[in-house]
Amino acid sequence: MNPCHAVHPNSHQEWRNLSIFSLPPFERAVRCIKYYEQLHTPENHPYVGYGHRIQPGEKYNYSMSELQADSLLRSDLLRLCVLFRDFGRDSLLLATLSYQIGPSKLLGNAKYSKSIILQKLDKGDRNIESDYLKFSHWNGKHIPSIRRRRMTELRLLLE
């Protein structure tokens, strides 16, 4: 099963009483992101919903409903899954990480070199946990809450 396959429940009530590990991987990723991001407010500009960065020409605002924010998150995460689809079963984990840090920090560009994680995966080496946890910094400082998030992502999504 493709871990990036989005499964939409008939209602949010259907998911409420289930263990997170009984949920499909995509739903686990959504829940994890929502838990750590929370709904953004005007102080979080240019981010809305659950961490969507407003792009030029987009007209999102902070009055969006939780359902609209959820839909936007799922759309963004699916787009990132497509970007990392060549990494197969690791595509959802990479998409989830890039949702927060941006895909260029993994894929590389003029400012960043290709991440060690992707270099290892390209060679078939899936021993990426320690490299994944290195993405626990903000403004050059190690942030314990970000490390907890990374550990949670690994536990929920690394197969």
What would you call each of these model-derived segments?
Residues 2-40, 52, 56, 64-83, ...:
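Long, amphipathic alpha-helical surface segments
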